[in-house]
Structures are given as C-alpha cells and as structure tokens.
Amino acid sequence: MDTMPNDLLVLLAVSRTAKFTTAAHNLGLTHSTVSRRISALKKSLGGRVLARSDDGWELTDLGERAVAVAEQMETAVAELGNTRQGPDTVTGVVRMTATDGFSAYIASPAVAKLRRRHPGLSVEIVTVTRQALQQRSGLDIEVVVGEPRVHRAEAMKLGDYELGLYASSDYLAARGTPASVDELSDHRLVYFVDSMLQVDDLDAPRRLFPSMKDALTSTNVFVHVEATRAGAGIGFLPCFMADRHPDLVRLFPDTAAERLPYWLVLRPDSMRRPAIAALVQALKDQMLAYRGALEGRGGTNRHN
C-alpha cells in the first residue's frame, strides 16, 4: 500500500470539520488540493473513505479505520516535538459536544485542571442538547442526557443530576407562593421549547405539571435560569445551576423533582488515544467532586 501519510492527515482534518473548505483553510491548502488528496486516498485504500450527509462529509467504515491510523500519526508527531521535556502523550485537539450546563460547570473546570498538567492539549466544546448521533464524524466525545441507543460506539454513565422547580424571591413576593403542586396551574413555566426538544427524558415538566402553561421557552438552559431570576415565571432548572443563585427559591423539593443521567459516548477505539482517555477520566473526576450539587444537595433556600 503506497498511501501517503499526508493524505491520511488531510482525511483527519476533513473528519473533524465535515467540510473540505474548512479543512483546507485549517491546513493551508486549497479546496482542490484537499479533494485530490481524498481521491488519492480512496484509490490507495480501494474504497470510499467519506460519504455525503446533510451536515457535510461523514466517515465510512473504511474512513474511520483510516482516521484511527491518522490520529496515531498525529500523536506520534506531537511526542517527537516534546522530546526535550520528555514525551507527553496527552496532546492535540479533542472535540466534544455536551449540554450547556454540563459544558460550563463540569467540562470547563475539568479541562482547565487537565491542561495544567498537559499544556499541549486543546479541547473544543460544542454546546448542544440532543440525542447521541449515530454518525459522529469529527467528534471524539459526546455527553448526552438519558441512556443513548447507539451502534458501533461505547457508552458509559457519568452520573445523575436533579432538576427542580424554582422561582425568584421577588416573583413569589409579587405573585404569592403556591401552597401545593396543584396551585402551580396559577403560574407559568420557564423551560425548553417543546417543539424543538430532542431529548425525551427532558420532557418531565409537561408530564409532572400538565396544567402549567408556558411563560418563556428557550433552547438554552442559561436563558431558563436568568428568565426565572427576572421573574418571567417558575423555572424547571438543573439544581446545580439554580442553587448557585441566592435569589432563587426551590419549590416542593421532595415532590416536584426529576433525576436524569448524563451519559458519555465515544468510538470504541477512542480510548486508545491518551488525550481522550485523560479527558474522559477528568470528566468522571469532576462529576464525582460536584456530586452533591448535581444531586440537588447544595441549595439551602427551599419552600416545601
């Protein structure tokens, strides 16, 4: 096989961006050069390495095997560059997706701690709330809410987090504090846009409090928190985010709550790459350190 190493690295760049134009820009090449390199790789390997999708280019089975080799090459080159200080295998770029809250309060501090030990590591986080993808071209790690149903992927549970009802102290002073769950029908909900919600497990408030109508909805959980603090309505919020704000009061913590799991998804061979294995462990460690807040045991401002 006379496959050129450069062709594999070009495929790696395309797999991470899903687009020839972006890969070309990142590599300092032209679009036509990237196209030629991919065509040459297809000829050398005897099959297609990429397939078109709605979001760009996705790896075929052959392409995934080729990218695994390219990642090993990338790691080896990075190790050679660190020979003066001793090889640090936790280097390169790791790309992950996660929900907004997880990205801010779990992933971000985990990455910060990890990079203090491994400054050659770079992590790209795309915030999104959705089910796990069946094709994850360009992604190393996905963190999703709810147990995923995936093929040709490894899934592991990271831990649970709790959601509860919250209202601002000013809102309760103006509108009155509901004395029971039944009285929630007199108030409106701050939560996700129902028609755009892609995760079934997150549809809890429509099941738990069906009489509540929407006040303000958004695809971003930080909007939920700030809208609730501003008095837009009663929010159904992750406790580890809401309990950070002393102006928010948790309502009916013993009866109006939902506990959901965070799951991590990655390709079966991804843990062979030291950078990915290190980040996965860092995320687990941060989940454990933050467990009390995640499970709703960090707040003191409650109304039963």
Predicted regions and their residues:
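Central regulatory/effector-binding core of bacterial HTH transcription factors
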Residues: 91-151, 300-301
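Residues within the DNA-recognition helix of helix-turn-helix
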Residues: 30, 37-40, 110
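C-terminal regulatory
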Residues: 136, 148-262, 288-304
